[in-house]
């Protein structure tokens, strides 16, 4: 099936083969091949199953262009287009707070390029924060296997500096200083709600 983004680019497809929660005897090392998206989905399943939080990946509406019907009981989508650019990757509810965040990866070792975000994503997060929501970004340095949660307020600061002629990237040292490092564990894979608890405490 061919799916087109609004800007004409082809999408990068991710396949989640980890639909079940891990049992205690499973090794963390067995999951090193998981994508960041899979790791987040896996963690969200853990939180949902234990009634801790309800957070899901956002579906993106598509417009069907070509559909084949090889059988009466089955339809095969041959071509489709995303109707509009996506905002952020995930949203949900935790402790009565609206949660909204995006997940980004970079192969750079020392900085994260701000071009990985789009203006409409930043604007969406600003609007959510203005309504009392909690927004942040997962930023993973894949070559170093380091993952951070950066609160939206810090992301906005660097975004605005870039717009005013500042750096076009965020130094990893600054992300480590202003964000929260997420350490991998067995269950949940990414215990990121611990960092969200700190963001909530700072709001009080």
Curated annotation (Swiss-Prot):
Residues that hold Mg(2+) according to the record: 87, 89, 102, 121
Site described as Transition state stabilizer, located at 104
The processes (GO biological process) annotated in the record are:
chromosome segregation; DNA recombination; DNA repair
Which cysteine-cysteine pairs are annotated as disulfide bonds in the entry? none
InterPro entries, alphabetized: Resolv_RecU, Restrct_endonuc-II-like, tRNA_endonuc-like_dom_sf
Keyword field: Cytoplasm, DNA damage, DNA recombination, DNA repair, Endonuclease, Hydrolase, Magnesium, Metal-binding, Nuclease
Q: Which domain of life is it from?
A: Bacteria
> Which cofactors are required for activity?
Mg(2+)
Molecular functions (GO terms)? endonuclease activity; magnesium ion binding; nucleic acid binding
- Bias (Polar residues): 7-24
- Show the GO cellular component annotation of the record: cytoplasm
Q: Which reaction does it catalyse?
A: Endonucleolytic cleavage at a junction such as a reciprocal single-stranded crossover between two homologous DNA duplexes (Holliday junction)
Localisation: Cytoplasm
Q: Name one Pfam family in it.
A: RecU
Similarity section: Belongs to the RecU family.
Main function: Endonuclease that resolves Holliday junction intermediates in genetic recombination. Cleaves mobile four-strand junctions by introducing symmetrical nicks in paired strands. Promotes annealing of linear ssDNA with homologous dsDNA. Required for DNA repair, homologous recombination and chromosome segregation.
> By its UniProt entry, which NCBIfam families does this protein fall under?
PRK02234.1-5 (NF002584), recU (TIGR00648)
Protein name in UniProt:
Holliday junction resolvase RecU
User: To which species is this protein native?
Assistant: Limosilactobacillus reuteri (strain DSM 20016) (Lactobacillus reuteri)
Gene name for this UniProt entry: recU
């Amino acid at each position: 099936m061919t799916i087109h983004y609004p800007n004409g680019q082809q999408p990068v497809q991710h396949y989640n083969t980890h639909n079940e929660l891990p049992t205690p005897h499973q090794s963390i090392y067995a999951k090193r091949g998981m994508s960041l998206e899979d790791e987040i989905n896996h963690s969200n399943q853990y939180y949902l199953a234990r009634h801790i939080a309800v957070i899901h990946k956002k579906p993106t509406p598509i417009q069907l262009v070509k559909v084949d019907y090889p059988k009466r009981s089955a339809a095969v989508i041959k071509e489709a287009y995303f109707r509009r650019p996506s905002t952020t990757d995930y949203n949900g509810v935790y402790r009565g707070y609206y949660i909204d965040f995006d997940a980004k990866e970079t192969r750079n070792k020392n900085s994260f390029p701000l071009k990985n975000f789009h203006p409409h994503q930043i604007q969406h997060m600003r609007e959510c924060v203005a309504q009392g929501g909690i927004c942040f970004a997962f930023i993973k340095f894949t070559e170093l296997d380091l993952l951070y949660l950066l609160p939206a307020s810090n992301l906005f600061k660097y975004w605005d500096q870039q717009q005013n002629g500042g750096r076009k990237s965020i130094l990893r040292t600054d992300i480590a200083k202003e964000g929260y490092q997420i350490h991998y564990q067995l269950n949940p894979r990414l215990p990121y709600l611990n960092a969200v608890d700190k963001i909530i405490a700072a709001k009080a």
